Amino acid sequence: MKNIQDLLCRGVKEIVVKKDLEQALASGKCLRVKLGLDPNIPDLHLGHAFNLRKLRAFQDLGHTAVLIIGDYTATIGDPSGKDKSREAVDAKATSANGKIFLEQIFKILDKDKTEVHPNSEWFSKMNFLEVLDLASKISMEHIMSHETFRQRIAKHQPFFLHEIFYPLMQGYDSVMVRADVELGALEQKFNLLTGRRLQRAFGQKEQNLLMTDYLLGLDGREKMSKSLGNFISLRDSATQMFGKVMSIPDTAIGHYFEMCTDIRESEIKEFEKRIKAGEGKQVKIELAHKITEIYHGEKGAKKAEQDFEAVFAQNKMPDKMDKHSFGAQKISIVGAMIESGLVASRSEARRLIEQGGVKINGEKVGDENLVVNLSKPKILQVGKRRFLKIKK
């Protein structure tokens, strides 16, 4: 993302209003570019990193990154694309997660050129009359144009009043920070457009919108998602990150080069030719090295590649692996997998056990009700590429 053309084209699905944004970028004015992230869990993943890297590209062009940590919006959860209401998340948890977010975010953004605002900064101070005033700025006609709400009604599935407030809250964030541009996934288009409406209602110039594609998850089919557990976390160690990239299907390699690196399009086409010529594994190693290097440096990427080769070419465990202490002498195998962050849900843990993908000290786990005795440290392996030393 070294220039304006790359910024506006790479991984971008739609721009509102493109001509206005191009003129603003050409004007030399310092733009306020907003990106919001909801800290419903502590992890950011490579899908989030794409827009963070877009935001960094704006910074490199001299613009101000305005980062919204949605500790209040996260308590509701974005209803877009969901056929039922999300479970409520405790505000204390979202606040704590937001602080962990920043450690990951500043692996990408320039801290000195970034404004950070939790949206509790304004929502926690609003009284009910102010909430009603905000609600009066958006018509029910607009709300009912949301495809998700229309589909729920058509399927006789309920949606609740608090869900209606999500797009209002995201939009009001833009008012409070006076955003010139907002970044977001295409699936958030309704929320982003609501921001423009609210800015107009509050007498502000409407923000331009840059809407991006989504990154495919590890299966190469569905969107990378925290809820699906198919993600590569920015908190993963170099070895974990490298191994997870190596698990994606060959069909997703070009997509990952486009969305997760700055490799030029011409080079990506050359990589795709090599894949067709049977060099898929080697190209994937180069991809995994490149991605790991972005977040862990060349030294970390090189060591992760060596660990990978040792594990799979020589059938050895990595020399170094992450450690996790549970504070108890016994823990269920499913609980250990979830608490350590190796999986996102009980259903994912059970599925992996059922498929024979979980081992303790090299022994396959066949019982999802197994209780692990941690009187001595053990090696927990999930899948072919994830190893963790666990202890009490």
How would you describe each model-predicted region?
Residues 18-79, 183-189, 195:
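N-terminal catalytic cores of NTP/NDP-binding nucleotidyl/phosphoryl-transfer enzymes
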Residues 82-87, 132-136, 227-228:
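Short, hinge-like loop/turn segments at secondary-structure boundaries
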Residues 12, 90-211, 218:
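Divalent-metal (Mg2+/Mn2+/Ca2+)-assisted nucleotide/phosphate chemistry catalytic cores
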Residues 1-27:
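N- or domain-start disorder-to-order transition segments that initiate the globular core
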Residues 199-392:
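Conserved nucleotide- and phosphate/pyrophosphate-binding catalytic cores
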Residues 28-36, 65, 166-176, 217, ...:
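Short, hydrophobic/aliphatic alpha-helical segments
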